[in-house]
Structures are given as C-alpha cells and as structure tokens.
Amino acid sequence: MQRVSGGYYDGRRFRRGTVGWEDGVIVETTSGLAREPLAKGLIIPPLWNAHTHLGDAVVTRELSGSIEELVAPPRGLKHRVLARARDQDVIRAMRRALVTALNAGTGGVIDFREGGIKGLKLVYRALLGLPTRAAVLGRPSGLTFNRREVSALLRACDGIGVSSYIDWPAGELRKLAAHAAQAGKSFATHCSERVREDIDAVLELKPTFLVHMIHATDSDLERCAEARVPVVICPRSNAFFGMTPDVPRLLRAGIEVWLGTDNAMISTPSLLREMEFAYRIARLRGGVPAMEILEMALRGRRFVDPKATTGIRVGNPADLVVFALPDGEHGFASLLRAVEADIALVVSGGIARRPPLPSEEPTGTKRLRPRRAQRTSR
C-alpha cells in the first residue's frame, strides 16, 4: 500500500491524517501520520476544469477586440485561425495547454471542441499518453443541423457544446439538442455572456450545464436553480472583456457553480490561477469562503459522475494531488495562493508521479489511446 500524509480534504474540512491506496482505489483514511509517506502536505482530489476551448491555444498573438470579434462563430478570430492552421500546430498547442492544466493539479477537463469530426480527431491526438481525463463536447462544422454529421459526432464524443443560443437559428438548435438527448449524450451552451438571453428558451433545450450567465437576471438564476442546471463561471476570461461574474449572487440563488478557464488563447488552463482570481473578484461583491472556491474547482467531475463527491473517501479512485503547504486550519486560504511549484505529488489511477510533466509527445503515442471520461447518466 502507498500513502500520503498531512491534511486531507473530506468534503467539509481538512482532516489531519493519512490517505492510503492500492490497486487504484483509496482503501484507508486514518487520523495517524504515516512513518514514510510518499509526500506530505495538503491533500485534495484532482481539480476539474469545467470549461475549456483548448483548440484556440494555437492563437498566440496579442489580442484586442470584442467577444464577437475574437470568439463568436463563424468569423471570430479564433475560428479564422483554426480554419487555416496546420493540424500538427493545433495538436501541439492543445497538448501544451493540457500539460499546463495537469501541472496545475487538474485531473480532468470538459472541452468544447470546434471543427466537427476533424476537431475531435485533433483533440484526441493531443490527449494521447497524457494522464488526464477529458470529456469532449463537439459541435457541427456550421450553424445548421445535419443529422448525419451530428450522429457521427455523437458516436465519437460525450455530447454537444455550442457557442450560444443567439448564434443559432432557433429551430436548428432545438433539433441539435433533441438529437443529443435521443443519443443519451449531453448538451451544453454558453448563455448570457454577451447579452441577456431568453432563459426559458435555453432551458427548453434541457442543457446539462450552462456557461457564464454574466448578464442573467435574478429571475433567470432562480429558473436555473429550479431546473437544477449548474453554471460554469470563467472569471479571468470574462475580465478580459471587461466583465466579472457575480459569484455571491449565483450562490445565493442556489445554483451549483463550477469553475472553468474558457479560451486557451485568453487564459492559461490553470485552475490554480482561476481559483485565486475567482476569490478576489467575489470580494468585490461581498466575498465567498475560500472553501466554496475550492468546491467550484472540484465539482466539474460531476459531469462524468453526477454522484461524485468532492472529498476524499475510502472507495474512491486513487486520484490525488498533494501540495507541499502547511496543513493547519488555514488550508483553504493556502490553496488559493498556491502555485504549480507547490505541488509535491500527483496520483492518477493509483500511479504516483512527481511534477512537472514534460509537454513533448511521448514515443510511440500512435499505439496509445486517450483517457476519455465516460459520463454516467444523470
């Protein structure tokens, strides 16, 4: 059996003790400290990045312009760059972004993948050999519903993730969402990022989650809470465009909030940076506890397993991150100031490694398969 010691997060607080695992499963959590643990410090499950656009990591220029000019389909900058970029350049850029996420303690991502079937192939090549889970939400190559194309997409990914309700002809989007539901796959969309959108029309699509909700009213948020639809916030991306999510208001409405990093061309996919920034911008509107920010960064796992806990428990997969930080009563605050260099050990499927992970593609990756998350039904 292998063990780590310090303060482990049980879903409510940090308990001083030891976590032990074997055969890829956590088999003990004890109050005593191991004599020779693999690492000591603050112990948490891996972070889950609930919203990324990894493909636009290929865009490296300094950016200026509005949301529409940079990211809106079909003529936003990222779409123009992706359309003419070499496949290998896109793959390398996505792989660098994934390694950045891994080295910041992330164990899984939910990626919105542009480019139809070809886009899916590229992200799966980028994932080859990396010790991460990825839930990939594809989208059609255009803003129209083509049953054959969508059926092929849904056979190859975990669902559909689109840019916005207002970007699509309403009838086409309803067909797209219905087809995903019929296939037993997820449907998700950005909502009220640029302007307020019709929340009733959006919720009629039965989304698994929504992203942003910057311009949502209190009534809109109440409707989301009633429908039990989580909202992913991406504060650094929003701030780039001169906006910030009202985190306390989202929580007061009773919404389950997840944390993501959004476009890789705007923000590095580091949830450590996102957590710190989310905590700071929440203070502008009254603040939220540091523990709540950590919870947001862990809840994205519920996309693939709705019953997943955010704490470390016996019987859970042996997926852990150990930070070389003091494990006392201020553990939550310490995590919100943590940087990549503070990570002492990462455990994935019971296999422990010391960071950082190199970004170079390993030899023989053509024979490897990406570790794609398999979502259970809600």
Predicted regions and their residues:
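C-terminal cap of metal-dependent C-N hydrolases
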Residues: 314-378
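His/Asp/Glu-enriched, well-ordered alpha-helical/loop segment
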Residues: 204-205, 247-326, 338, 344
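N-terminal metal-binding scaffold of metallo-dependent hydrolase/deaminase domains
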Residues: 1-33, 375
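Active-site loop-helix segments enriched in His/Asp/Glu that coordinate
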Residues: 82-157, 163-171
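Divalent metal-coordination and catalytic microenvironments
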Residues: 6, 24, 40, 51, ...
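Active-site core of metal-dependent hydrolases
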Residues: 143-146, 154-265
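Active-site gating loops and adjacent loop-to-helix segments of metal-dependent hydrolytic enzymes
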Residues: 57-92, 131, 154, 195, ...
